[in-house]
Regions:
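Short aromatic-glycine-(Arg/Gly/Cys) micro-motifs in beta-strand/loop hairpins
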Residues: 24-44
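Short, flexible coil/linker segments at or flanking structured domains
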Residues: 10-12, 21, 36, 44, ...
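Short N-terminal "domain-start" leader segments
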Residues: 1-31
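Mixed-charge, Lys/Arg-enriched low-complexity segments
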Residues: 2, 38-73
């Protein structure tokens, strides 16, 4: 069994701003988001301890829609 699995991908709107992948780490029991630019280069990972996968997916969708801003990037 894999220790992590990708749950979903959210593409930024407007296009050209990259995408976010929602992952779950079964060993750590942790949901997280990996953020990528349009060149498929990962530029940030955000952990969500003690949050549901639905919460993590909502955060990724909010980023893709421009509602959620990443701090310290």
């Amino acid at each position: 069994m894999a220790l992590r699995r990708k749950i979903s991908t959210y593409w930024a709107d407007p296009p050209g701003k990259g995408y976010a992948e929602v992952w779950i780490d079964f060993k750590e029991e942790l949901g997280y988001i990996e953020y990528y630019d349009d060149n498929e280069k990962k530029f940030f990972t955000e952990d969500f301890p003690n949050k549901s996968i639905r919460y993590v997916e909502d955060a990724a969708e909010n980023w893709a829609l421009g509602i959620k801003k990443l701090e310290n990037i």
